């Protein structure tokens, strides 16, 4: 008998729930269309569902007619986007994750105090673009540990660092250690910039890896945190696949013996997880599912002020 060990927590985090609810509530309150700058979260199933209900996803505010309503995605935006919205008389609703907003505020604050800011993250990720936009002249993005050796700052320069919220804890630890060795005076926030949900999902997966021989991460290929989950397994020599649909699960799994772990990125709907489990049961009829509870998440974020009445 083979087992699927189903990680808990998995799937939607509080920031994703809030962001999706913002678009849903806006559609209920004002009707279609509701424009959304960037995909509200990085999951094709979520985006397609909201499109069917009247959301229009755009990358450039010039695609939003003057006076219309626009929602900013959970990943955040640079300040100039907000300014453009005001100039064009757009009614904007901010669905930026509360934890991302916290990093925006910290970057703005420390830049105003004269610090140079090191932002650990992927330069092209929309979250990093938004954070860097708070103080572009003061922010340097570090993507990998090798970048630390090339930083130009003298020891006399005050330094502050933060990270993208969806990074690998392994990578962040390595880069942070390199920063502290090179710049012992560097400071950061009292708690990690990597969000609680990213940490929980990675640590939950890590805790079951000694018990399994294969991992499925249910999530979108565009999802940073889903990709990092796949890497958690691969770095520990456990084969892992990132899939976003039961159609992506092949009979390849029959080539592997032993138990299977399943987790899901923070923007993955639970019904997709369950449909993937059903597909595995078709391939392995005697498969047993066991839930492994690593942590209980009860975080809830309030809606933006525009939607509170």
Curated annotation (Swiss-Prot):
- Note accompanying the cofactor annotation: Binds 1 [4Fe-4S] cluster per subunit.
Q: What residues does isopentenyl diphosphate bind to?
A: 42, 75, 125, 223-225, 267
Gene3D superfamilies noted in UniProt: 3.40.50.11270, 4-hydroxy-3-methylbut-2-enyl diphosphate reductase, catalytic domain
The catalytic site is made up of 127
Pfam families, per the entry: LYTB
EC numbers for this chain: 1.17.7.4
What biological function has been recorded for the protein in this entry? Catalyzes the conversion of 1-hydroxy-2-methyl-2-(E)-butenyl 4-diphosphate (HMBPP) into a mixture of isopentenyl diphosphate (IPP) and dimethylallyl diphosphate (DMAPP). Acts in the terminal step of the DOXP/MEP pathway for isoprenoid precursor biosynthesis.
Q: What is this protein called?
A: 4-hydroxy-3-methylbut-2-enyl diphosphate reductase
The organism of origin for this protein: Chlamydia caviae (strain ATCC VR-813 / DSM 19441 / 03DC25 / GPIC) (Chlamydophila caviae)
Quick one: which gene encodes this?
A: ispH
